[in-house]
């Protein structure tokens, strides 16, 4: 499968392809200093320096060699977070130095899929399947007891923080179809932010707080499959003003985790070649 990492500038519509491979790769994160991307492929985590994007370098994740596409970088740029099933057989969240090292387990319970880091670096947000369904949780970045923010009654996924740290955006079908919602970081004030005929996943507030990027599937799509005609859309931070930034062949793996450039002028995504 041909995979391409693309950088898109919403203000101009300009794009550039920074990496092409015949391996299935997913979910680019942008480093806080803007110099490199991190992505996953073949169960491993890779670093792509934007000054020399022809040769990505593997980040040593120790025993964790079954990483999925739910990974990211701490706000200070020193720490990598991964979701991996090597140890438990189910997705579990770990942290390690950004240049590689021994993973340190963060979540006691499984399965857990990382999605967002608070702007102050103290807390992580993630989706987790427990006995009563899939919900949004937070945990201290150093580990410890998890806090459940949502109350069941549907599927909850894709949590990511606003840059002021006051809200967490996520997607849920609690209203019937998969739409975007937000909740305060203490679990109060849940609000629906989109309400249309698309199937909407993985919201990512921009670092400057002016827009939220998300993945929009065609009406009636079940789950979040790959290899579909999809759109990357933008919505205003208080809702409304929805516009399409990119139409592509992709879906799962395109923007599962935070992908904005630190200056909010661009975002990175993955698209795939049609079979």
Located regions from the model:
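Short, flexible, glycine-rich and Lys/Arg-enriched loop motifs at helix boundaries
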Residues: 2, 62-66, 216-228, 248-254
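Structural motif
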Residues: 2-5, 44-47, 89-94, 133-137, ...
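Multi-bladed beta-propeller domains
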Residues: 7-24, 50-66, 96-111, 139-155, ...
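Conserved beta-propeller blade repeats
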Residues: 22-37, 65-80, 109-127, 153-171, ...
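Beta-strand C-termini and the immediately following turn/loop, strongest in propeller blades
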Residues: 37-43, 80-87, 117, 125-131, ...
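Beta-propeller domains
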Residues: 40-53
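Loop/turn-rich, solvent-exposed surfaces of beta-rich toroidal or solenoidal domains
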Residues: 176, 197-233
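C-terminal closing repeat unit and adjoining cap/tail of repeat-based domains
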Residues: 229-252, 256-273
């Amino acid at each position: 499968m041909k995979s391409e990492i693309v950088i898109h500038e919403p203000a101009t519509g300009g794009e550039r392809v920074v990496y092409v491979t015949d391996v299935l790769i997913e979910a680019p994160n942008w480093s806080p200093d803007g110099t490199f991307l991190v992505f996953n492929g073949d169960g491993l985590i890779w670093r792509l320096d934007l000054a020399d994007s022809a040769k990505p370098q593997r980040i040593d994740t120790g025993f964790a060699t079954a990483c999925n596409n739910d990974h990211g970088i701490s706000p200070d740029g020193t720490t990598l977070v991964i979701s991996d099933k090597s140890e438990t057989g189910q997705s579990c969240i770990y942290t390690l130095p950004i240049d590689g090292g021994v993973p340190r387990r963060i979540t006691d319970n499984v399965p857990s899929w990382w999605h967002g880091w608070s702007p102050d670096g103290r807390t992580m947000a993630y989706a987790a399947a427990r006995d009563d369904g899939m919900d949004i949780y937070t945990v201290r970045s150093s580990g410890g007891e998890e806090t459940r923010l949502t109350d069941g009654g549907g599927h909850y996924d894709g949590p990511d923080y606003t840059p002021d740290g006051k809200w967490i955006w996520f997607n849920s079908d609690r209203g019937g179809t998969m739409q975007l919602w937000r909740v305060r970081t203490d679990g109060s004030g849940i609000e629906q932010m989109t309400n249309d005929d698309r199937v909407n996943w993985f919201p990512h507030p921009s670092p400057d707080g002016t827009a939220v990027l998300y993945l929009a599937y065609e009406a009636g799509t079940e789950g979040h499959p790959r290899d579909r005609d999809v759109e990357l859309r933008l919505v205003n931070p208080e809702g409304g003003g929805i516009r399409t930034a990119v139409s592509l062949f992709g879906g799962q793996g395109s923007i599962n985790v935070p992908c904005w450039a630190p200056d909010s002028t661009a975002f990175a995504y993955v698209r795939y070649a049609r079979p």
